[in-house]
Design a protein with these regions (language model features):
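Short acidic/glycine-enriched loop/turn segments that link adjacent beta-strands
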Residues: 64-67, 187
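Extreme N-terminal starter segment of soluble prokaryotic enzymes
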Residues: 20-22
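Surface-exposed interaction/gating patches
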Residues: 24-31, 36, 118-192, 196-212, ...
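An amphipathic, aromatic/His-enriched active-site/gating alpha helix that lines ligand/cofactor pockets
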Residues: 2-17, 36-58, 64-65, 74-117, ...
Length: 258
């Protein structure tokens, strides 16, 4: 039986995976301001966060919501998260640009705090090189984040099901599963930035060559007997409500891209 063991920062470094703690952040922005924030973020808020120990994993445009900006960042553990966020938000770069950033936002509190479901299920970023400041070539790749909601903590048997049945089936139909996480239930160590409490989620990320490849995958799901007969019903039996699917287009400087 699969064991959802909490990964230490030492394990993460030795395995080349990122990260033991991950934030999935969805911002609702003022109409027409998404590219304004992305330009500011990609120029000012990547290296400045990484200089204090934050891993900026990826930044995205949500293709289904023109005024939503989604991004991911990671930490070694909850203690270092508190220090890193204190250093960044108390530092000169954020102070210089916070008014411009905040002016683009309606809401920035839609945040899920996550940890890898398994020691091997974090992001592998070793071969993903971030383009330099000033790059404007937007990748064609699509990153899809699927959020499953549960009535209680994600059970070990669901992780077994995902590993042994769901993941092989999805892979065979064209999905490249990148990483998967469950809720990190530790107390928020930086309360100045709220996170969503009381949630029990399993979030998995997949990467596609482009939007057309994802649409082909969705079509293949509906035509697959294996999916209909062996996977879909089991999946629905675990879930507390309908899944949430985020179709995410990486920005020009997103590290997570393809």
């Amino acid at each position: 039986m699969t064991q959802p063991i909490r990964e230490s920062s030492k394990q993460a470094r030795s395995s080349g995976l990122c990260c033991p703690v991950v934030e999935l952040r969805q911002y609702t922005l003022q109409p027409g301001k998404r590219d304004v924030l992305i330009n500011l973020f990609d120029r000012e808020f990547i290296e400045s966060q990484e200089s204090v120990g934050i891993e900026v994993i990826g930044q995205f445009r949500d293709l289904d919501h023109s005024d939503r900006f989604v991004w991911l960042r990671g930490f070694r553990d909850m203690t270092s998260r508190a220090k890193a966020l204190t250093d960044f938000y108390g530092g000169p770069v954020w102070k210089a640009h916070r008014e411009a950033a905040n002016a683009t936002m309606i809401d920035s509190d839609n945040v899920l705090l996550l940890r890898p479901a398994l020691p091997t299920s974090g992001f592998s970023l070793e071969n993903m090189k971030r383009p330099p400041v000033g790059s404007d070539d937007v990748p064609k790749n699509l990153v899809v984040a699927t959020i499953y909601y549960f009535e209680g903590p994600v059970a070990v048997d669901f992780i077994d099901f995902f590993e042994q049945e769901f993941k092989p089936a999805a892979t065979s139909l064209g999905a490249r599963v990148s990483a998967y996480f469950v809720t990190e239930n530790s107390e928020n160590t930086f309360p100045a930035l709220p996170v969503r409490g009381g949630e029990n989620v399993f979030v998995w990320f997949s990467i596609f060559q482009d939007l057309a490849a994802y649409e082909n995958y969705v079509a293949a799901l509906s035509q697959s007997e294996r999916w209909r007969d062996e996977v879909s019903g089991q999946l629905e039996s675990y879930l507390g409500r309908a899944p949430e699917v985020l179709k995410l287009s990486p920005t020009s400087r997103s590290q997570l891209r393809g």
